[in-house]
């Protein structure tokens, strides 16, 4: 399987005004860094041309300046959930220029799967590698990456060459069934692995 390699600016061109975008990662670890900055640049260019541009932003947790900071400064976020901790985001939220839903971050993936928060148009995730058959080896933070990759129409993968390739096999990605079908998580001893490494 071959994958198209594009620049961050080209990747940003796949994201449109009013899209809902799910970002992988958990805190700054594993959060995409280059593509969100390119989205912010695109938003600023659209605003300078007199056109609207703002997206819904869904993340696994707080992020980094390249995502929450850059997008907030560019007035590129219409809706944000769950947890965030960036000063620029807080200022935009408090000035009522961004809708914010302070949901507990552990509820987000399930609520997205239920469809409570609308359609995820694009997933943007950071990865260490992508196998020939399309398995995504995530970086140092997973967050909601598995859920948004399942739900999105398009997936943009930001490869982080600073992550060691030895991260392959590090993860144990498991998504429990949604209620009312959820069962216990079958981890009974520290060495149990119940999910997949990709």
Which residues fall in each region the model found?
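Conserved alpha/beta enzyme-core scaffold
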Residues: 1-198
């Amino acid at each position: 399987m071959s994958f198209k390699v594009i620049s961050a600016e080209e990747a940003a061109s796949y994201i449109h005004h009013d899209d809902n975008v799910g970002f992988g990662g958990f805190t700054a670890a594993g959060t995409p860094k280059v593509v969100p900055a390119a989205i912010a640049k695109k938003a600023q260019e659209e605003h300078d041309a007199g056109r609207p541009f703002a997206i819904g932003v869904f993340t696994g947790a707080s992020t980094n300046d390249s995502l929450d900071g850059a997008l907030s400064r560019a007035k590129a976020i219409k809706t944000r959930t769950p947890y965030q901790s960036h000063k620029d985001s807080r200022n935009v939220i408090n000035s009522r220029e961004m809708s914010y839903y302070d949901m507990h971050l552990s509820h987000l993936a399930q609520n997205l799967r239920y469809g409570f928060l609308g359609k995820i148009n694009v997933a943007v995730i950071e990865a260490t590698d992508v196998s020939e058959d399309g398995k995504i080896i995530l970086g140092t933070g997973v967050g909601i990456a598995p859920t948004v990759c399942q739900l999105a129409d398009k997936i943009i993968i930001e490869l982080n060459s600073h992550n060691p390739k030895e991260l392959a096999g590090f993860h144990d990605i498991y998504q429990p069934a949604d209620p009312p079908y959820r069962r216990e998580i079958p981890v009974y001893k520290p060495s149990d692995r119940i999910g997949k490494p990709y």
